[in-house]
Every structure is written in structure tokens, then in C-alpha cells.
Amino acid sequence: KTKVIAITHLSNVTGAVLPIKEITQLAHSKGIIVVVDGCQGGPHLKLDMQDLDCDFYAISCHKMYGPTGLGVLYGKKKWLEQLPPYQGGGGMINEVKKDRISYGELPNKYEAGTMATAQVIAFDQSIKFLESIGIENIIKHEKELIEYGQEVLKKNNSVKLIGNPK
């Protein structure tokens, strides 16, 4: 009777990249909502939310050279419209009555209180910085570092490599 699964996209422990698209297809075939922890995936993988088809994907901005205290949550519109906010605050509520409350339109429905404007501007610059390098170049460089690290560590008999990140 599983309703929701939460999985990581890229493990910061083993380097394993989970097949999110395939996992999502299987989960959706059973009516299960898929939430992906993309904190490691965001800065290291080429992401296409339409292709992955997960219901939610969370990214931590500081993992992408952005400010701390800020994150991004991608959510499918059908879920964002359907689910209530987890907290309330100014700017997100349209109307309060004795017996009901109505929330603003997306994305305001989930923007409680004062937005962290400086952090959002800083994160925009982080994205531009990463885009100037190019995700393909980042992936290529990381692959070269992994191959070099594995080559050096395999020569050390005191080290046992676990996993095979790519």
C-alpha cells in the first residue's frame, strides 16, 4: 500500500546514479508518487524534469555554489494545486473566513512570508556561472577526476574501493 517513495538521484556516499526515469515509470504504474532528493544531482547531472517525470525534485542551492538557506522544489502542477501548504504566512493567502481559507495562485501558494530576495539573486548568478561552464564540461571533468582517483587508489593495497561511480 505504498503511496509515496523518496529516493536520491545521485549518492554522495557511493557516487551511484539511480535510474530515476525507470523507477518513476514503475512507481507511477502502481499509482505511487515519486519524490527525488536531487541535492547532489542538481549540480552534477543534466536534468530534464519532463523526461524524468518524477512528481517532485528537490535541490539545495548551496550545492550549486549558491547561498545557504535556499532551495528549489520542482513539483508537477497537479500536485502543487492539490496539496495544501505546510505553513502559512503573508502573501500566500487570498482570503480567510471563519470556516475556510483560500490560498493564492501558484507559486504564491507556497511562498510564506518575505522572500529571501538577496539569496534568490545570488542563486541566479550561480546558475549563470554553471551555465557558462556547461554541464557537459562539468560532467567530463568529473569523469576525468573519478578515473584518475580510481587509478591512483587501485595502486594502494591499503585501500579497498567500494562501488564504481561513473
Task: Give the positions of each predicted feature.
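Pyridoxal 5′-phosphate
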Residues: K1-K166
